[in-house]
């Protein structure tokens, strides 16, 4: 059976792991790193870069280098969070035809799942390079507080990348699996505090051990899908920009190139301040005006950074209280606290969490890798590699429909264990009503308009009757991925209408199919590009070796032969500057043919050198070691 890989598709970094025998293993990418920056760039020559290569060129290609795309997945353009990002991101965020937030990629409107798919493709390739076989299935993690739209968009990204997402699991739950896998027997209740690059989650999880079988049951979850390391970076960036403006009288926000350099420097400074009390942000030639070049050189202390982000850290505490309340527990009931996500390395975050729970968080869980490890273990459960593990996750938000008076009536409450199914009977609101509109909602507010609209559908053909007579049974069915299926049935006629909430990612089936085909054709283009690079490298090596032999041969090669070799060298040097693989191979073969004499000359040189060595060794062979005795003169 093929492997089901585990992928942590993060806002800032992504990570892939597999089950290697009975142990999960995090895989290194082609750059030798265990995590990959979730950065995608589209270059002028049509190449798509992912990870470190994309990050390295971001300064000179800011408009077409995309990061933190996870914050836009499954969101509407009009969302408050989207509007906030729109003003600070160096790339363009646009409104799609159906109102979703899309991006401008080299002037083309592109859906966020299509861009996220490039990161998934990189994870897929990393696993395939290690395993030596094709990978088609994965378990992918999402923030626990992702709504239905965001989950569906993640599944769409998987399809576009060529992966069937067998299961979507929540990031804190995956981290709990990684933590609980090797722990001894006994039951425990843990809190997973997950503050990543763009999202924040808190989950209260009970781990039960019965006769060696571990059950991970999520009791409650809460969070904020727009709070993370990116927000911390932006606070520091804004501070540096404002200080620079005071000193130099120039607003760096007008210079996209400078802002990209500043983003990298701010991220680096934030990381350094987790272990140092002070750091320098030194950016020579950050910009220029009529008076000449401008340089940035500022000192930033840990205390200053903490004062800039204190309210962000405090924002993460309120969901902790709600999650504990929903789980029916108090702080004293929590046995262990697990920190996940790179932003939890900040000492201020660790202190706030420790103060809230009254205990120090565990330090034996890698915050960057735990989620991918948990996803790989769940992949092992689905493929049958891992036994004795049961995962019981929950839906993060209540689900219901709009009823008379614009009220949301919940059918499934938040923190209900999934998969689950629930039905409720409603009646018609008017006399002789022949159709009803089922408006599906997700959220905790009483007014329907204040909740997230997931979609709507009509049930027609209801028999005319006085209001309140016709009975409509509405059924909500949530699968293990947390994705919702809704049906409405007229109990009098048996007429039924069903819907799977799919439109939420903003992509129709036809659009997804087209993107899948585009991705497949791109993978063929990528393969051809790799072959071209390989042939170019071989040709470069041949040119270098031929030049060296030509120099060594000296007058052992006739002037005519030398001229033909030099012409063939020049032809190959010209060919490798082009894109025609066949032409390069042809010119390389021609050079190999005309330089055959060089090979002979090289062998002659080698033979004569060996002969000289043999002559010298013959002299040594005739020599005899003599014993001698020192005779001292008598005094």
Curated annotation (Swiss-Prot):
Residues 612-635 have a biased composition (Basic and acidic residues). Residues 601-611 have a biased composition (Low complexity). InterPro entries: ATPase_NBD, Chaperone_DnaK, Heat_shock_70_CS, HSP70_C_sf, HSP70_peptide-bd_sf, Hsp_70_fam. SUPFAM superfamilies: Actin-like ATPase domain, Heat shock protein 70kD (HSP70), peptide-binding domain. Induction: By stress conditions e.g. heat shock. Residues 598-635 are annotated as: Disordered. One of its GO terms (molecular function) is ATP binding. Transmembrane segments: none annotated. The keyword DNA-binding does not apply. Keywords: ATP-binding, Chaperone, Nucleotide-binding, Phosphoprotein, Stress response. PANTHER family: HEAT SHOCK PROTEIN 70KDA. Belongs to the heat shock protein 70 family. Acts as a chaperone. This is Chaperone protein DnaK. It comes from Hamiltonella defensa subsp. Acyrthosiphon pisum (strain 5AT). The gene is dnaK.
């Amino acid at each position: 059976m093929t492997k089901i890989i585990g992928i942590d598709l993060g806002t800032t970094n992504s990570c892939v792991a597999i089950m290697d025998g009975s142990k999960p293993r995090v895989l290194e990418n082609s750059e030798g790193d265990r995590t990959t920056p979730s950065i995608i760039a589209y270059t002028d020559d049509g190449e798509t870069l992912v990870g470190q290569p994309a990050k390295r060129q971001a300064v000179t290609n800011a408009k077409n280098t995309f990061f933190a795309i996870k914050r836009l997945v499954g969101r509407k353009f009009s969302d408050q969070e989207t509007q906030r990002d729109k003003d600070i991101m160096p790339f363009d965020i646009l409104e799609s035809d159906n109102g979703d937030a899309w991006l401008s990629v080299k002037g083309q409107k592109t859906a966020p799942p299509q861009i996220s798919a490039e990161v998934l493709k990189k994870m897929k390739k990393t696993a395939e390079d290690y395993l030596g076989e094709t990978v088609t299935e994965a378990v992918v993690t999402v923030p626990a507080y992702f709504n239905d739209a965001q989950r569906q968009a993640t599944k769409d990204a998987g399809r576009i990348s060529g992966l069937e997402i067998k299961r979507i699991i929540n990031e804190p739950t995956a981290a709990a699996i990684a933590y609980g896998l090797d722990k001894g027997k006994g039951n425990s209740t843990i809190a997973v505090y997950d503050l990543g690059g763009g999202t924040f989650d808190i989950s209260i999880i009970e781990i039960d051990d019965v006769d060696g079988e571990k059950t991970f049951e999520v009791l409650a979850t809460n969070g904020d899908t727009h709070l993370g390391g990116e927000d911390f970076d932006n606070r520091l960036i804004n501070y540096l920009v404002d200080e620079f403006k005071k000193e130099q009288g120039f607003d760096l926000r007008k210079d996209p190139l400078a802002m990209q350099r500043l983003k990298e420097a701010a991220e680096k400074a934030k990381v350094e301040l987790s272990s140092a009390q002070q750091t320098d942000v030194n950016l020579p030639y950050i910009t220029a005006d009529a008076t000449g070049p401008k340089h940035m050189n500022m000192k930033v202390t840990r205390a200053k950074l903490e004062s800039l982000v204190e309210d962000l850290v405090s924002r993460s505490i309120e969901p902790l209280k709600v999650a504990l309340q929903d789980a029916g527990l108090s702080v004293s009931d929590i046995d262990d606290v697990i920190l996940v996500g790179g932003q939890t390395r900040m000492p201020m975050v660790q202190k706030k969490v420790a103060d809230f729970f009254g205990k120090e968080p565990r330090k034996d869980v890698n915050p960057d890798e735990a989620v991918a490890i948990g996803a790989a273990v769940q992949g092992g459960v689905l493929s049958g590699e891992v036994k004795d593990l049961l995962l019981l996750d929950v839906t993060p938000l209540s689900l219901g429909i709009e009823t008379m008076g614009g009220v949301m009536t919940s059918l499934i409450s938040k923190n209900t264990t999934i998969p689950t199914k629930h039905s409720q009977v409603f009646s018609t609101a008017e006399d002789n009503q022949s159709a009803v509109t089922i408006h599906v909602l997700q959220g905790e507010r009483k007014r329907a308009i204040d909740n997230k609209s997931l979609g709507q559908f009509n049930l027609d053909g209801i028999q005319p009757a006085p209001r309140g007579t016709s009975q409509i049974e509405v059924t909500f069915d949530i699968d293990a991925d947390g994705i919702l299926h809704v049906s409405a049935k007229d109990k009098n006629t048996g007429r039924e209408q069903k819907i799977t909430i799919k439109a939420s990612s903003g992509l129709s089936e036809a659009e997804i199919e087209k993107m899948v085909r585009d991705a497949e054709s791109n993978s063929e283009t990528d393969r051809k590009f790799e072959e071209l690079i390989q042939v170019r490298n071989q040709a470069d090596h041949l040119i270098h070796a031929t030049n060296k032999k030509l120099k060594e041969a000296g007058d052992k090669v006739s002037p005519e032969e030398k001229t033909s070799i030099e012409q063939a060298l020049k032809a190959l040097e010209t060919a490798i500057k082009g894109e025609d693989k066949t032409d390069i191979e042809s010119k390389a073969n021609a050079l190999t043919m005309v330089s055959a004499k060089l090979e002979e000359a090289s062998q002659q040189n080698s033979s004569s050198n060996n002969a000289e060595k043999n002559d010298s060794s013959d002299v040594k062979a005739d020599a005899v070691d003599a014993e001698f005795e020192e005779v001292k003169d008598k005094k």
